[in-house]
Amino acid sequence: MSKYSFYINKYQEDLLKDLDTLVRIPSVSDESNPVDKKPFGQGVAHAFEAYEDIAKRLGFEVEQDDGYAISANYLDGEDYVGVLGHLDIIDAHNKEDWEYNPYKLTVKDGILYGRGVNDDKGPLLINLYAVRILRDMGCTFKRPVKVIAGGAEETTWNCMKHYFKTHKQPLMGYSPDGNFPIVNGEKGILTFETSYPKADGVFKVVEIRGFEQDYMIPSQIEVCVYCENVEDLSSELKNAFKDHEATFTFTGKSALTRNPQRAVNPLFALADFVQKYSMYFDGGFVALLSDVAQYLKDPYGQDCNIYYEDVDMGKTSIAAYMLQMKENAYSVRMDLRYPKGVDPLQIEASLCALFPSLKKIREKRLLFVPKNSELIQKLADAYYSVTQEKAEPITKGGASYARVLDCGIAFGATFDGYDTKCHQPNESMPLNDLLRALEIYCEAIYLLACE
């Protein structure tokens, strides 16, 4: 039993009810039709309203930021401790692949299921409860605490851009949108798209399916083609056609594009197939997939001359994904993650030499905080006090709001050894992990704000 156990047990039922309230809201960020005070659509606005109700009930003052972000504040003052998370989510695509309703909290055999239980509604919520528990214990706060929720982390980050235009940076802080023990490095992100013009072919590509979710290598893709003269084809191809159309399916293993080494990318199986039957496909499609296979197969970028390994942050990575058919061209995207010691302009130059019409569509600066910093030392102490394990900092390819902080890192809430299926069907988190993370956050906020 720790000093926080009584209060964690006291609040567990309320915590799960509040998490269910948040999970039930399909708060997918949508900036296509912004209205006053709802720049990210009705879903995010609804989540902000629910968050406000919860925070006020727990004793926070709540500040709205024009619908871009919402802050639950305990005490006033400029030199505050900041906890930055998000209430927007990735849409629960392929609901038939979910074992349980993604928009309802399900607790089964000690596991919490639902969109947002891990990313990031659950971790954000338990930080509200951590502050409440410290107050109940009579702890003296020497610094204010703000638990800030954004509404566009999964998309544009316009939430935090707007918030910090008018709000001072915290003295120090963290984002509960990563992993334990401590994420002191987040690789730089570059996303490019290259396009190849369409040409004539015996096969006309009618549709490409499987790339509905951004920044995800799918487990399966399908290419539907039309052929006018099926009788002219070889027998092995002819049998695949019905009414002049055929659908070819290629399977692999899904993974986030930031972890291409964990995937079996079905794009490369498609590329092999198209190369084998290149005499039937249009030249642009053949050329694009040939270059994808030649330059992007190695997940660390050795084939496209961008490989680098840093002693602290690890290797570069690159993933090919999002094959699309446009009006006059075919395109594919490349998601790159790079450590310190790499010049992003050199990466772009290397890829420009290999791919025509390269267009940069996303860039985020890397984050690296030396492990001897005061912030990391205090968070390491908090982690050790609960787990009795030394907190060795790690680097991730993902992006958290820690990148917008002058002094901040990602800290939890995912523990090593459990696959939360973040951004995928059946997102989940063990209840014991959530409660253990709550205990760690209690100690972390105590060390940052009360000592």
Residues covered by each model-derived region:
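Active-site metal-coordination/substrate-binding segment of hydrolases
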Residues: 80-149, 155, 168, 424-427, ...
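Acidic/His- and Gly-rich active-site-bordering loop/insert found
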Residues: 2-113, 137, 141
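Predominant activation on well-ordered alpha-helical scaffold segments within soluble catalytic domains
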Residues: 20, 52, 125-132, 161, ...
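Acidic, glycine-rich active-site loops and adjacent beta-strand->loop/helix elements
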Residues: 87-89, 145-156, 176-181, 212, ...
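Acidic-glycine-rich active-site phosphate/pyrophosphate-binding loop
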Residues: 94-107, 194-196, 241-250, 381
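Midchain, well-structured core segments that form catalytic/ion-binding scaffolds
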Residues: 154, 161-339
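An extended, acidic, His-containing surface patch that forms the Zn2+-binding/catalytic region
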Residues: 258-327, 333, 337-349, 357-451
